[in-house]
Protein backbone atom coordinates (compact mmCIF):
# COMPACT_ATOMS: atom_id res chain seq x y z
CA UNK A 1 0.00 0.00 0.00
CA UNK A 2 1.34 3.39 -1.00
CA UNK A 3 1.16 6.37 1.32
CA UNK A 4 1.04 8.72 -1.66
CA UNK A 5 -2.22 9.40 -3.46
CA UNK A 6 -3.36 11.02 -6.68
CA UNK A 7 -3.29 14.80 -6.28
CA UNK A 8 -0.45 14.91 -3.74
CA UNK A 9 2.41 17.33 -4.40
CA UNK A 10 5.72 15.49 -4.38
CA UNK A 11 9.41 16.29 -4.84
CA UNK A 12 11.85 14.00 -6.63
CA UNK A 13 14.70 13.01 -4.29
CA UNK A 14 16.74 10.78 -6.64
CA UNK A 15 17.37 10.42 -10.36
CA UNK A 16 17.71 12.70 -13.37
CA UNK A 17 14.86 14.97 -12.23
CA UNK A 18 16.10 15.38 -8.65
CA UNK A 19 14.73 18.52 -6.98
CA UNK A 20 11.75 18.95 -9.30
CA UNK A 21 8.21 19.18 -7.94
CA UNK A 22 4.97 17.96 -9.42
CA UNK A 23 1.50 16.58 -8.78
CA UNK A 24 0.82 12.85 -8.68
CA UNK A 25 -1.26 11.74 -11.68
CA UNK A 26 -1.37 7.98 -11.08
CA UNK A 27 -0.17 5.33 -8.63
CA UNK A 28 0.33 1.70 -9.69
CA UNK A 29 1.80 -0.77 -7.20
CA UNK A 30 5.26 0.63 -6.35
CA UNK A 31 5.41 3.07 -9.26
CA UNK A 32 4.12 6.61 -9.58
CA UNK A 33 3.47 9.05 -12.45
CA UNK A 34 4.15 12.71 -11.71
CA UNK A 35 3.09 15.64 -13.89
CA UNK A 36 6.07 17.05 -15.83
CA UNK A 37 8.58 14.56 -14.40
CA UNK A 38 10.42 11.66 -16.13
CA UNK A 39 9.52 12.76 -19.66
CA UNK A 40 10.27 10.07 -22.26
CA UNK A 41 10.01 10.01 -26.05
CA UNK A 42 7.61 7.49 -27.56
CA UNK A 43 7.35 6.61 -31.25
CA UNK A 44 3.69 6.08 -32.15
CA UNK A 45 2.70 4.13 -35.25
CA UNK A 46 -0.33 5.48 -37.10
CA UNK A 47 -3.49 3.38 -36.81
CA UNK A 48 -6.37 4.05 -39.19
CA UNK A 49 -8.80 1.84 -37.28
CA UNK A 50 -8.63 3.98 -34.13
CA UNK A 51 -7.76 7.25 -35.88
CA UNK A 52 -4.45 7.66 -34.05
CA UNK A 53 -1.88 9.74 -35.90
CA UNK A 54 1.71 8.58 -35.91
CA UNK A 55 4.67 10.59 -34.76
CA UNK A 56 7.08 11.22 -31.95
CA UNK A 57 5.36 11.93 -28.62
CA UNK A 58 6.73 13.16 -25.31
CA UNK A 59 4.93 11.88 -22.23
CA UNK A 60 5.43 11.19 -18.54
CA UNK A 61 6.58 7.71 -17.56
CA UNK A 62 6.23 5.94 -14.24
CA UNK A 63 9.10 6.12 -11.75
CA UNK A 64 9.71 4.15 -8.58
CA UNK A 65 7.92 5.46 -5.52
CA UNK A 66 11.15 5.40 -3.47
CA UNK A 67 12.53 8.20 -5.66
CA UNK A 68 9.90 10.72 -4.53
CA UNK A 69 8.78 12.18 -1.20
CA UNK A 70 5.70 14.19 -0.31
CA UNK A 71 6.26 17.93 -0.16
CA UNK A 72 5.30 19.54 3.15
CA UNK A 73 3.24 22.60 2.22
CA UNK A 74 4.37 24.63 5.25
CA UNK A 75 8.11 23.91 5.26
CA UNK A 76 8.48 23.39 1.47
CA UNK A 77 10.73 20.39 2.21
CA UNK A 78 10.48 16.67 1.60
CA UNK A 79 8.66 14.84 4.38
CA UNK A 80 7.27 11.46 5.30
CA UNK A 81 3.73 10.39 6.16
CA UNK A 82 2.39 8.74 9.29
CA UNK A 83 -1.14 7.68 10.18
CA UNK A 84 -3.28 8.47 13.20
CA UNK A 85 -6.94 7.94 14.03
CA UNK A 86 -8.87 11.17 14.52
CA UNK A 87 -11.54 11.89 17.12
CA UNK A 88 -14.22 10.79 14.68
CA UNK A 89 -12.51 7.40 14.30
CA UNK A 90 -11.28 8.00 10.76
CA UNK A 91 -7.68 7.39 9.75
CA UNK A 92 -5.77 10.58 8.94
CA UNK A 93 -2.51 11.12 7.08
CA UNK A 94 -0.07 13.38 8.94
CA UNK A 95 3.32 14.89 8.12
CA UNK A 96 5.88 13.16 10.29
CA UNK A 97 7.97 16.30 10.94
CA UNK A 98 5.28 18.59 12.40
CA UNK A 99 2.18 16.41 12.84
CA UNK A 100 -0.04 18.54 10.59
CA UNK A 101 -2.81 16.83 8.62
CA UNK A 102 -2.01 16.28 4.94
CA UNK A 103 -4.45 18.20 2.74
CA UNK A 104 -6.19 15.82 0.36
CA UNK A 105 -6.89 16.93 -3.18
UniProtKB/Swiss-Prot annotation:
GO terms for biological process: translation. Part of the 50S ribosomal subunit. This is Large ribosomal subunit protein uL24. GO terms for molecular function: rRNA binding; structural constituent of ribosome. The gene is rplX. The lineage of its organism: Bacteria, Pseudomonadati, Pseudomonadota, Gammaproteobacteria, Moraxellales. Transmembrane segments: none annotated. GO terms for cellular component: ribonucleoprotein complex; ribosome. The keyword RNA-binding applies. One of two assembly initiator proteins, it binds directly to the 5'-end of the 23S rRNA, where it nucleates assembly of the 50S subunit. One of the proteins that surrounds the polypeptide exit tunnel on the outside of the subunit. CDD domains: KOW_RPL26. The keyword DNA-binding does not apply. Gene3D superfamilies: 2.30.30.30. Keywords: Ribonucleoprotein, Ribosomal protein, RNA-binding, rRNA-binding. Belongs to the universal ribosomal protein uL24 family. It comes from Psychrobacter cryohalolentis (strain ATCC BAA-1226 / DSM 17306 / VKM B-2378 / K5). Coiled coil: none annotated.
Amino acid sequence: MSKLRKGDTVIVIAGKDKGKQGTVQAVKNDRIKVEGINIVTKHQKPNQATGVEGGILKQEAFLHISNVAILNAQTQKADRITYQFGEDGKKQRLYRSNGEVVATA
